[in-house]
A protein has these predicted regions:
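Residue-level signal for alpha-helical context at structural boundaries
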Residues: 38, 42, 61, 193-194, ...
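An N-terminal, well-structured beta->alpha segment
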Residues: 1-49
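General structural signal for secondary-structure boundaries
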Residues: 8, 32, 83, 183-187
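Glycine-rich phosphate/diphosphate-binding loops and the adjacent beta-loop-alpha structural elements
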Residues: 6, 51-54, 58, 198-209
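Residue-level signal for pocket-adjacent positions within structured domains
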Residues: 22, 26, 83, 90, ...
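Glycine-rich phosphate-binding loops that contact phosphosugars or nucleotide phosphates
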Residues: 44, 52-183
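Internal, active-site/partner-interface "lid" segment
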Residues: 137-140, 154, 181-209
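Secondary-structure transition/capping residues
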Residues: 35, 54, 186-190
Length: 209
């Protein structure tokens, strides 16, 4: 019995890895720099006027949002995590008219996110949607939309967010690269924001004496 379970587990992992590889290759082929121009432009124009960047999502995309807020911040674009459900219970108070909010939803139809995006727009903010459904409510309600779609999630039942999370993360990492390139973010500035850990050890080479 234990041997059969072990073999079933191995086969499940192998199937998921194959699925993730197929989805990654197919999705990566759809990524083009031009697709990010509008989103990056909206963020940069907002920053010039004192606006700030936020990221939000419900469920697993909410965890992607927290990671992306950290990544944007550490690469030259201060960014804030906006809790996907708390936003409609007072957390929209962190928003100021003219800010930009990136909203992540694979389906683009999640009820809680609809309420949050509506509140965001009512506070005078620009919305950049990230979704696997270009015909979704989120895509229609966004000022710019980035596609992050996959054909299957992988794993047992093909339901839990796996491959879609990889696509959403890759999409926003690409956006972070586009923004960082606009910021003239050199090693000195990077190390000043990231003095700890192995990356922080670069300070001896990067920082002036």
């Amino acid at each position: 019995m234990k041997s059969r379970r072990k073999e079933a587990s191995k086969q499940a992992v192998d199937r998921f890895v194959d699925s993730a590889r197929r989805e990654f290759d197919a999705f990566a082929a759809t990524l083009h720099g031009a697709d990010y121009e509008k989103a990056a432009s909206l963020i940069l124009e907002s920053q010039k006027k004192g606006g700030r960047l936020h990221v939000t999502g419900i469920g697993k995309p909410g965890h992607v949002s927290a990671y992306m807020a950290s990544l944007f911040s550490s690469t030259g674009n201060p960014c804030y995590f906006l809790h996907g459900t708390e936003a409609v219970h007072g957390s929209c108070g962190q928003l100021v008219a003219g800010d930009v909010v990136i909203a992540i939803s694979n389906s683009g139809e999640t009820g809680e996110l609809k309420a949050t995006v509506t509140a965001i727009k009512n506070n005078g903010c620009t919305v950049i949607g990230v979704t696997g459904n270009p015909d979704s409510w989120l895509a229609r309600e966004s000022d710019a939309c980035l596609f992050a779609g996959v054909g299957e999630e992988g794993g047992p039942l093909n339901r839990a967010p796996r491959n879609s999370i990889l696509a959403e993360t890759l999409t926003l990492q690409a956006l972070s690269v586009a923004l960082q390139a606009e910021q003239d973010w050199d090693p000195v500035r990077y190390v000043r924001c990231h003095p700890g850990g192995k990356l922080g050890q670069l300070r001896e080479e990067a920082l002036p004496c």
